[in-house]
Amino acid sequence: SFLRAFVDYWFDLANEKADWNGKCVLVQPIAPGLAKMINEQEGLYTLYLRGSENGQKVDDKRVISSVSRCLNPYEKADYEKMMDVAASDDLEIIVSNTTEAGIVYDPACQQNDCPPSSFPAKLTQVLYHRYKAGKKGIIMLACELIDNNGKELLKCVNQYIDQWGLEDGFKKYVNEDCTFCGSLVDRIVPGRIRDPKEVAELEEKHGYADPLLDVGEVFGVWVIEGDTKLNDILPFRKAGLEDHVFVTPDMSPYKKRKVRILNGAHTGFVLGAYLAGFDIVRDCMHDETILGYMNKMLLQEVVPILPLDQDDCKKFAAAVEDRFNNPFVNHELMSISLNSTSKWRARNMPSFLEYIEKNGKLPTCLTMSFAAYIAFYSNNIQELNDKGLVCKRAKGNEYTISDDRYVLEFYNAHKDDDIPTLVHAVMTNEQMWGQDLTKVAGFEEATVKNLTLIREQGAMAAYKSCL
């Protein structure tokens, strides 16, 4: 949903406004996907951008025509077609958005896998095929929400080049002829409209049904880090989109502000809010306790430790409430919960640790957010199946957690632990956090206390205790 509501949208505008005449070929990162449906519609789909812009309500509908087709590389014929695209003279740009867990080096991936499981391994295969075909280098735009996403992706590709024993000429091609750019994406994309009544009303209004209908907020910014000469290659400045899509030599100020404030707010409150019975982000903004908890976390624990202009950060934080309160978008908390382990590590843990370094004490709300994360992943576990870890919340319904398999297996294995044992096991799992979090003074004791409060009195009482 995100790539279609963001990347393909900007290229669609470039086609219209700059006569770019480009097409996007989508490639599924995993076997289940929308390839068949997208191809049945010849790449066409309806996008609604909804929200507020300059104080005015916006509800724009656009049929996106920048997608030519979608390939599922887990099917042999499509894998071969992917390699045909790799060797095409027309290929100029590759864009990735495989979540925080996507840019990883997995040594189990082999050169002859069709396809390998990790995205960097797939990309290495694609670039090697292109190199052997004698084609020019490409521009790689990584959109994953990790620090130095472009550099980290290039690092993974180089690891596969070494592991697979590929020639030095190819390594030079990747590192010199190809351009790996980091980028920052900022648009909330809930995906499809889930209210059957609203879907029926739109179908009646526009005269057609679109099972690929996508929804995003009207706000959108894409910051690409690289040589500003890329502005002459990419179509966006020519299309007059430079306020929304632009190249800068250093995107770190934009990145840190967005990930720590906007994304950090999401991961910081949604897991506890879901356990408290909420399902939609907007509804959380109408609850004084959750809103107060989020604003305290942002304004007292996150913004003050950012080495950026404080007024700009406060304005950005203030806009978060408006964006989350979008009347058009039913952004489900469960959709945000995807890969929350790596999300908390990337979005919240840096603010948490830097706050402690600056203030010499634990940040109240960020500390609570970690306990809420553990509570969400361990709440009345029912089973572990192929779809994920099935838990049950107090409201009565089951929910399925999607995360790396090792994370789900970990929580399933510890489902009968008492609270202190579980907290200690989670905090000492360095595969999850990159360090032993029990070494943070007072953090383990505080998390045991907070998780106990959530389990005994509920997440809402826990959030209220932070205010």
Predicted regions span which residues?
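Substrate/ligand-engaging "lid" and interaction regions
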Residues: S1-L467
